[in-house]
Amino acid sequence: MEKQHLKSQIAALRVPTFNIAWPERRSPKADVVEERMMKWADHHKLLVNGEYRDRVIRTRYGLLAARCYPNAGEELLQAIADYFVWFFLADDLFVDRVEVVTDETIRNLTAMIDVLDRNVAREEPVFGELAWLDVCQRLRDLLQPEAFQRFAQGMRLWATTAALQILNHQRPKSVGIREYEAIRRHTSGLNPCTSLADAANKGSVQAHEFYQPDVQKLVLQTNNIVCWANDIQSLGMEIQQPGQFRNMVTIYIQQGQSLSEAVSTTTARVNNELSDFCKLADIVTAPSISDELRVYVDGLKYWIRGYMDWVVHDTERYADKFIASDADDRCVSTLNPSLLNRSSSSATE
């Protein structure tokens, strides 16, 4: 009933545009990175059929990387673009666009954690496991050890908080806003992305600066801005998903608001968070700080602006015309995993 009620109203949804104070940026390597990303995804058997290939082509994950990391060196930018295509496809097939929980859910998610903890794949890898191992090994080589561990911890939390998201969707009604926010900031996968912001700007922020309360608050605000905006932008697609569909907008509706009111409330929260981010960023960067911290804050700004521009100008991931074909991946998720993982790369246990 919860989903059916929203489906009947969703055609009237008007997605707001968010105004960002700093200019658009994009790496000049965008096109070549996108092309190589597609070849890499092919090599690792991530594009499971022609329909999936078409979906990835029109989604433009390489351009998301190019917008969010405009100053990254070519090797790191390529690794990030490959990570993006892997992450979005794995997230869809493991959690979002399949049944709330399946016989393979635990095996799939623990395999991703194992790659981080053991630096090897299993003897019988699940979908995307060898691709994930390849990304992690490349990032280990490209990043400082602590920087890689920040990325890895963010991904461990993505895999583990997915269980909380699943539990929430097994309840008759969603948890409240505060509980949802705690889950959302980790299932989004954004913390691993922001952990790369300094390296992508040719810096390596030190721990004593990275873990300052105000710096961590900027990281949280970046996460909130992107996630809450995405809750509006992806609502039309997500409400049609068989698995995960509850988000900030639907929870406000559950609390008694109309769809229009819930979107307005969420929009206001995004704009308020954006305003607070700008004020705090000015405070953090006003005194004499290291160049590494300064470029890290710049990297957070690139992520906010880059994501928003990607949604408006580049991607069709949330396009209404593809909802019917893209929202439900249950038929894809039941394909024989052994067929999806025949790849010539990497070691296994």
From Swiss-Prot:
Mg(2+) 2 binds at residue 96. The record marks 92 as: Plays a critical role for substrate recognition. GO terms for biological process: isoprenoid biosynthetic process. Its cofactor is Mg(2+). The record marks 88 as: Plays a critical role in the stabilization of intermediate cation. Keywords: Lyase, Magnesium, Metal-binding. Binds 3 Mg(2+) ions per subunit. It is an enzyme of class 4 (lyase). A motif (DDXXXD motif) lies at residues 91-96. One of its GO terms (molecular function) is metal ion binding. It holds the Pfam family Terpene_syn_C_2. Terpene synthase that catalyzes the conversion of (2E,6E)-farnesyl diphosphate (FPP) into sesquiterpenes which are important for fungi-environment interactions. Produces a mixture consisting of 8 sesquiterpenes including corvol ethers A and B, as well as traces of epizonarene, gamma-cadinene, delta-cadinene, alpha-cadinene, alpha-cadinol, and an unidentified sesquiterpene. Produces both corvol ether A and corvol ether B in similar concentrations. The Asp-Asp-Xaa-Xaa-Xaa-Asp (DDXXXD) motif is important for the catalytic activity, presumably through binding to Mg(2+). This is Sesquiterpene synthase MAC_05714.
